[in-house]
C-alpha cells in the first residue's frame, strides 16, 4: 500500500480489546477497530482509554485502522 493512499484522521480511544486492538471513535462520530503500529509497539508506548490518537485508514476498508500517534 502506497503512503499516498492512506487516510489520516484523529480520534479518541473508547475501549481496549485483547491483542492490542482498540475501539476508536473518530472525529466524525464513526467507530472503528484499530491496532497499534509497529513503532508504537517497539517503543512500549502505552495507549489507554480516553487517549487522543491519530489513525491511518485504508480507503478500501473504512472499518479498520492503525494507530500511528498518541497525543500527550
UniProtKB/Swiss-Prot annotation:
Keywords: Cytoplasm, Initiation factor, Protein biosynthesis, RNA-binding, rRNA-binding
A Pfam family annotated for this UniProt entry: eIF-1a
GO cellular component: cytosol
Compartments in which it is found: Cytoplasm
UniProt domain S1-like: residue ranges: 1-72
GO MF entries: ribosome binding; rRNA binding; translation initiation factor activity
Alphabetical list of InterPro entries matching this protein: NA-bd_OB-fold, RNA-binding_domain_S1_IF1, S1_domain, TIF_IF1
HAMAP family assigned to the protein according to its UniProt record, in alphabetical order: IF_1 (MF_00075)
Family statement: Belongs to the IF-1 family.
Chain's role: One of the essential components for the initiation of protein synthesis. Stabilizes the binding of IF-2 and IF-3 on the 30S subunit to which N-formylmethionyl-tRNA(fMet) subsequently binds. Helps modulate mRNA selection, yielding the 30S pre-initiation complex (PIC). Upon addition of the 50S ribosomal subunit IF-1, IF-2 and IF-3 are released leaving the mature 70S translation initiation complex.
NCBIfam families reported for this sequence: infA
Subunit and partners: Component of the 30S ribosomal translation pre-initiation complex which assembles on the 30S ribosome in the order IF-2 and IF-3, IF-1 and N-formylmethionyl-tRNA(fMet); mRNA recruitment can occur at any time during PIC assembly.
Record's protein name: Translation initiation factor IF-1
Protein's organism: Streptococcus mutans serotype c (strain ATCC 700610 / UA159)
Amino acid at each position: 500500500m502506497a503512503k499516498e493512499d492512506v487516510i489520516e484522521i484523529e480520534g479518541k480511544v473508547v475501549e481496549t480489546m485483547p491483542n492490542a486492538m482498540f475501539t476508536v471513535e473518530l472525529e466524525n462520530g464513526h467507530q472503528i477497530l484499530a491496532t497499534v503500529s509497529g513503532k508504537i509497539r517497539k517503543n512500549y508506548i502505552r495507549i489507554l482509554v480516553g487517549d487522543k490518537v491519530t489513525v491511518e485508514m485504508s480507503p478500501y476498508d473504512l472499518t479498520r485502522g492503525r494507530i500511528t500517534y498518541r497525543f500527550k
